[in-house]
Amino acid sequence: LGSWSVWIYDVMFKLVTSYATVIALHDRLYKKNNGHVISSSTLDEKWLQNFKEPNLKKIKFLYVARINPEKGIYEFLEMFKKADLGAEISIIGKTKSLTLHKKFQSLIEGMENINFPGYISSRESLIDAYDKHNILVLPSFTEGQPYVVDEALARRRPVLIFEDIAHIIKGRRGIFVSKRDLE
C-alpha cells in the first residue's frame, strides 16, 4: 500500500470518529468536541488533600512496587547497606514467586532499619505510608509510566530514580536522577 496506507488510515479515522465518542489519554491525541480526555492515573481528590509535612529529622525512604529483579530493589538494598546513612526504608509490595520472596527475606534479615509491611491495597493506608516517609525511591532498570511517581509527587514527596529511567521525568519537578554506584 505504501503512502496510500497513511491516507486510508486518515480517512478511516475521520469517518469512524465523526460518529463516535472518543476517549483519549491526552488532549494531543484528540481535540474534537465529541471526545473525552481521561487520566490513566489512580489518583483522586484524596491524594491531594490533608498534606502532612515530612519529618526531616531522619531520612526515611519509601519503596512502593513489586519486589522483583527488574525493579532494582535488590541492588538498591545492597547500596543502602553500604552507604550506612543512618536512614530507614519501608518496602511496600509483594514478590511474584516464593523463591524471590525467600531471596528478599534473606537480604533484609537482621536489618532493623528496613521495614517490610508487604502489599498495601488500602488507599488511605498507602497515603499514610507516603506521609510518614520523606523520599520515594524507584530503582527500576526499566519503566513505562510508574504511577508511584505521581502518587509521591501528589503527596509532595521527592522521588529518587536512576539514570536508566530518566525518561519518566517528562517535565515534572521533584524527580532527582542518581547514578547507580556509591562513588
Please give the residue ranges for each predicted region.
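Conserved acidic donor-binding segment of nucleotide-sugar-dependent glycosyltransferases
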Residues: 174-182
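A conserved mid-protein helix/loop that constitutes part of the nucleotide-sugar donor-binding site
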Residues: 59, 66-82, 99-102, 127
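Short alpha-helical segment that forms part of, or immediately flanks, the ligand-binding pocket
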Residues: 127, 146-154
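Glycosyltransferase donor-sugar binding loop
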Residues: 64, 88-102, 116-120
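Short alpha-helical donor nucleotide-sugar binding micro-motif in glycosyltransferases
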Residues: 119, 128-133
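A short, active-site helix/loop in glycosyltransferases that binds the activated sugar's phosphate group
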Residues: 2-51
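Aromatic "clamp/platform" in nucleotide-sugar-dependent glycosyltransferases that forms part
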Residues: 141
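Short hydrophobic beta-strand element within catalytic cores of glycosyltransferases
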Residues: 154, 158-161
